[in-house]
UniProtKB/Swiss-Prot annotation:
<comment type="function">
    <text>Clathrin is the major protein of the polyhedral coat of coated pits and vesicles.</text>
</comment>
<dbReference type="InterPro" id="IPR000996">
    <property type="entry name" value="Clathrin_L-chain"/>
</dbReference>
<dbReference type="GO" id="GO:0072583">
    <property type="term" value="P:clathrin-dependent endocytosis"/>
</dbReference>
<keyword id="KW-0968">Cytoplasmic vesicle</keyword>
<dbReference type="GO" id="GO:0032050">
    <property type="term" value="F:clathrin heavy chain binding"/>
</dbReference>
<feature type="region of interest" description="Disordered">
    <location>
        <begin position="44"/>
        <end position="156"/>
    </location>
</feature>
<keyword id="KW-0472">Membrane</keyword>
<feature type="compositionally biased region" description="Basic and acidic residues">
    <location>
        <begin position="124"/>
        <end position="146"/>
    </location>
</feature>
<feature type="compositionally biased region" description="Polar residues">
    <location>
        <begin position="147"/>
        <end position="156"/>
    </location>
</feature>
<dbReference type="GO" id="GO:0006886">
    <property type="term" value="P:intracellular protein transport"/>
</dbReference>
<comment type="subunit">
    <text>Clathrin coats are formed from molecules containing 3 heavy chains and 3 light chains.</text>
</comment>
<dbReference type="GO" id="GO:0030130">
    <property type="term" value="C:clathrin coat of trans-Golgi network vesicle"/>
</dbReference>
<dbReference type="GO" id="GO:0031154">
    <property type="term" value="P:culmination involved in sorocarp development"/>
</dbReference>
<dbReference type="GO" id="GO:0000281">
    <property type="term" value="P:mitotic cytokinesis"/>
</dbReference>
<protein>
    <recommendedName>
        <fullName>Clathrin light chain</fullName>
    </recommendedName>
</protein>
<dbReference type="GO" id="GO:0048268">
    <property type="term" value="P:clathrin coat assembly"/>
</dbReference>
<dbReference type="GO" id="GO:0009992">
    <property type="term" value="P:intracellular water homeostasis"/>
</dbReference>
Length: 194
């Protein structure tokens, strides 16, 4: 057989799927099936040479003449063979590894959940502390403003307005330029509108 890619010796392998076995190719008539758990089943097939010799004879004896042993149906009447020790050892080892992996994964998950809860608790406690401090600072500032306004130190309101702002602050490029507003407030303080 020639290969389109230039290799002369090409080995052809076939995989048999259940039901695809050619009984003429079997030597001893036994077929071994392996289920998903690694348990193998062995079934016996009919001898085709005897069936072909007696195919004109409709007697049941000719049908059963090539049959050696009892026929096991695929419906589940088969008796499972013992799993090979190496396969059993591998399956046990694999199962243990999967259980350990699952256990470690669950431990990591619980650890992440605990860390997330702790992080949320810290965030909320810091937030509450900041809110309380800001509230206290605002109350103190309002009290100082009230005492200044009731003390009567200023003769008119524009002086009190100018005292609330920082006249020495330099303009910040990120913020709007407030130099014009400061200039207006200083003029009003010096020459109040009557």
């Amino acid at each position: 057989m020639s290969d389109p890619f230039g290799e002369e010796n090409v080995e052809i392998t076939e995989e048999f799927v259940e039901g695809d076995i050619n009984e003429n190719d079997l030597i001893d008539g036994n077929v071994e099936y392996v289920d998903g758990n690694g348990i193998s089943f062995e079934t016996t097939t009919f001898d085709n040479s005897n069936n072909n010799n007696n195919n004109n004879n409709h007697n049941n004896n000719s049908y059963n003449s090539g049959f050696d042993g009892d026929l096991s149906s695929v419906d589940g009447d088969m008796k499972p063979k013992e799993t090979a020790p190496a396969m059993r050892e591998y399956l046990e080892k694999h199962e243990k590894e999967m259980q350990e992996k699952k256990k470690k994964s669950e431990e990591k998950r619980q650890k992440k959940i605990a860390e997330a809860k702790q992080s949320l608790d810290n965030f909320y406690s810091e937030r509450e502390a900041k809110k309380k401090t800001a509230l206290k600072n605002n109350r103190d500032h309002n009290k100082s403003l009230e005492t200044d306004s009731t003390s009567g130190n200023t003769t008119h309101t524009w002086e009190s307005v100018v005292s609330m702002i920082d006249l020495q602050a330099k303009p910040n490029p990120a913020n709007k330029d407030t130099s014009r507003m400061r200039e207006i407030l200083i003029r009003l303080k010096n020459q109040p509108i009557v």
